[in-house]
Amino acid sequence: MAEAALAGQLPDAQSGLRLLTDPGIELLPLLQAAFRVRFHHFGRGVRIHILNNVQNGYCSEDCNYCAQAKNSKAPIEKYSIKSDEEILEGARKAYESGAYRYCMVSSGRSPHAERIDHMSKLIREIKSRWPVEVCLSAGFLDANKARELKEAGLDRYNHNLNTADGYYGSICTTHSYGDRLNTLQEARRAGLEVCSGIIIGMGEKPEEIVEVATTLRSLQARSIPVNFYVHVEGAQLGAVDQLTPAYALRALALFRFFNPDAEVRAAGGRESNLRGMESMALYPANSLFAEGYLNTTGHMAEKTVKMVEDAGFFVEKIEEE
């Protein structure tokens, strides 16, 4: 499969399903094949992303996996938008910690015009101070909002599909899968890179994981965060699937084969789901989060960098001009 991917011949759905479910496909040769594709496009470099949850809670949506959803009973700290000083300080720390990209995440259905103006100002300030790429995740966009963010210098917009179209109604009822697709398409039309991924382990079928990989390929997603579900006490979706490290690694390999030149990230839940096999994620994936997620903790940057280097990889940074 590596030879086919390197030649531009991408796998079909049946081949993808076999990668996830066929015990006759041994894990280590699969990871080695995925690494050949990863190495061709990214070498041994690893891009570290650091999130800043700039607004937490107060969300109108009912995504049942999310601790911030309107019907969640999770005991999270709710706060409106952080001060400019806090957000800029987060960017400075991200850069000094070795981050390739600083990702600002704001809860809510869609940012109003004043919020877009505010975020655009912050994006310009960050880009003027530090050589770091900037990603924003703030809900649904229309053409005008996407265009303003692009003009401000935003590199990438994140809006996760999270699961397949046919399963989406099982995890959310306040908006549709089509709403998410529309935002990704508007971001692309504005010239923004698209970041979109999945949460694995919410009760979906293997076929639906393959479907998401295929959809992201059609959207030309440049960044794919592969999250592994972690139940937060009080969230409406309980503990659903017990993922094994081997299954999680197979999923990362799947996304690499289906999206050979995309940035594939071992994202939320990697620590608790990959466990002792965490460093093996670097064979298919070329990107990691550090310093935690939205409402769950993760490894600090120093520990993440050490894991990367111990595994024979290196942290990739943007060169200063």
Curated annotation (Swiss-Prot):
Keywords: 2Fe-2S, 4Fe-4S, Biotin biosynthesis, Iron, Iron-sulfur, Metal-binding, S-adenosyl-L-methionine, Transferase. PROSITE patterns: RADICAL_SAM. Binds 1 [4Fe-4S] cluster. The cluster is coordinated with 3 cysteines and an exchangeable S-adenosyl-L-methionine. One of its GO terms (biological process) is biotin biosynthetic process. It comes from the Bacteria. Pathway: Cofactor biosynthesis; biotin biosynthesis; biotin from 7,8-diaminononanoate: step 2/2. InterPro entries: Aldolase_TIM (IPR013785), BATS_dom (IPR010722), Biotin_synth/BioAB (IPR002684), Biotin_synthase (IPR024177), Elp3/MiaA/NifB-like_rSAM (IPR006638), rSAM (IPR007197). [4Fe-4S] cluster binds at residues 59, 63, 66. It catalyses: (4R,5S)-dethiobiotin + (sulfur carrier)-SH + 2 reduced [2Fe-2S]-[ferredoxin] + 2 S-adenosyl-L-methionine = (sulfur carrier)-H + biotin + 2 5'-deoxyadenosine + 2 L-methionine + 2 oxidized [2Fe-2S]-[ferredoxin]. Belongs to the radical SAM superfamily. Biotin synthase family. This is Biotin synthase. It comes from Magnetococcus marinus (strain ATCC BAA-1437 / JCM 17883 / MC-1).
